[in-house]
Amino acid sequence: MSTSSSIEFELNGQKVNALAGETILQVAKRHGEEIPHLCYKEGYRPDGNCRACVVEIKGERTLAPSCCRVASAGMQVFSNNERARKSQKMVLEMLLSDMPEDGFKWSDEAGDLPHGELSDWAHRLEVKPRPALQQIARAPSQVTDASHSAMV
């Protein structure tokens, strides 16, 4: 697949072809590579808000959200190396730690995925929130916001 409307880059050490304007996440999905993602949905504008889909791009200092980063020729992308996986897992863990313990009743009748896609990705990446994070996230606030009379 080497046409003028496609470019070639490396994804986890494998050469892949991307169509012009295609994001790293779209290319990865097309080539059978799974990258965690929560806020991306085909057909909608990608915003990269959840940060679960971050990848490392060789030569760049910061991780990039694969859902809104357009692939470019020659780039080397790593979605499953230690740095990317650690960040992906941290995002999932932080989100899980702030969820209700019993989950959301609407998501899964069997109870296997109490938090929907979040539970699914956490299960796939073997992420479980640390009890200390859950305690912090669920602790009642000790500070009362008195910045406005309606809030007291």
What spans do the regions from the language model cover?
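N-terminal cofactor/phosphate-binding cores enriched in small/glycine residues
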Residues: 7-73, 87
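Intrinsic disorder at enzyme termini
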Residues: 1-3, 105
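Fe-S ferredoxin-like electron-transfer domains
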Residues: 51-52, 60-152
